[in-house]
């Protein structure tokens, strides 16, 4: 009887440690307001007052995977993107964040459901209808329709036979299917 009590006590202690560890590792509630607040803290750890005026522009789950993408803007600066992972407690943690270097950025993202092509960007002019990415090391092209919103996050599952989903040559297309990559880039530079 005493051994059973000890084993039960040990089991409870281990369970408490595991739950506490998971809560510490995945502190973000799965909602836009909580993600925005944690991004503010994450992006400006080194700022003097510890605050940031980050505005969350888009927040999406990649298919039915454990991965979420947050697209945010910082006034007077460029946009940024963060990758968040979900723990078994349904809470999130920030894996990585980066400032976007282009009007539309392409990347590959690995999830528990496979590898996805990821487009994050801005479409303030509303001229971008589609975005294409031709993989450099494979003969595969991703073609995605761009929504008529200022900011967007798009993803598409990459077939498992593709070994090198990054890098890719990205092309922005208008309604007529014409390449407007340079035009949109120049227009963005003039707006800034």
Regions found by a protein language model. Give the residues of each.
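Short, Lys/Arg-enriched, disordered terminal segments
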Residues: 1-9, 35-39, 178-184, 189-192
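Hydrophobic membrane-insertion alpha-helices, especially the h-region
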Residues: 5-25
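Short, non-transmembrane alpha-helical segments in secretory-pathway proteins
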Residues: 26-55, 124-133
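Short edge beta-strand/loop segments characteristic of extracellular beta-sandwich folds
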Residues: 116-126
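Extracellular ectodomain segments of secreted/surface proteins
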Residues: 95-118
